[in-house]
């Protein structure tokens, strides 16, 4: 018997995000004060902060992996970059999809 998912108002999310930018972790009294200001329970605020910290950590990890992939896949070379803007745009739209070269298929090395 779980509680239903509650969608926060834009004003509540704005206030949560504004406070998160100032401070990634809240003490219990700070959490209670913020919760009463935006009409949420302290538990809702606590969980939102936990989820948001995880989301930021995951986004940073994905961004670092994407930058590493771009560096590894020939960031140099200079000319002939006609397809690059489209490729970069596609990568920005789906940051968690990563191209992985096939090195071994059916136990046999693939030609490079």
Curated annotation (Swiss-Prot):
The keyword Nucleus applies. CDD domains: homeodomain (cd00086). Keywords: Activator, DNA-binding, Homeobox, Nucleus, Phosphoprotein, Transcription, Transcription regulation. The keyword Repeat does not apply. GO terms for cellular component: nucleoplasm. Residues 59-100 are annotated as: Disordered. Phosphorylated on serine residues. Transcription factor that binds and activates the promoter of thyroid specific genes such as thyroglobulin, thyroperoxidase, and thyrotropin receptor. Crucial in the maintenance of the thyroid differentiation phenotype. May play a role in lung development and surfactant homeostasis. This is Thyroid transcription factor 1.
